[in-house]
Amino acid sequence: MIIYSPLWQTMKDKGITSYALIYKHNISNGTLYRMRKGRAISTVVINDLCKAMKCTPNDIMLYVSDEENAAQ
């Protein structure tokens, strides 16, 4: 399972708001909603987020095995 908790920490660390992603970097509100809910996003969106925040995919998402997720 892919989780997006690193995104929120990266945004905080870099001082980037959801507002800035939506209005300055054209990331849709729907995309951020899907990420908050743990739903799938495209590689194009991952690329756009990395470009906007000058980071890597590891700064945006994390793989957690089903066993680890069940233990939490």
Where are the regions a protein language model picked out?
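A short, Lys/Arg-rich alpha-helix, primarily the initiator
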Residues: 1-20
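Short amphipathic helical patch at the helix-1/turn junction of helix-turn-helix
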Residues: 12-13, 37-40
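Short, basic-rich loop-to-helix N-cap that marks the start of a DNA-contacting helix
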Residues: 39-51, 69
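Short, charge-rich amphipathic interface segments used for partner binding and complex assembly
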Residues: 47-62
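Short alpha-helical DNA-recognition segment
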Residues: 15-33
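Alpha-helical residues within the helix-turn-helix
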Residues: 12, 23, 51
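Short, charged recognition helix plus adjacent turn
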Residues: 9-10, 34, 61-72
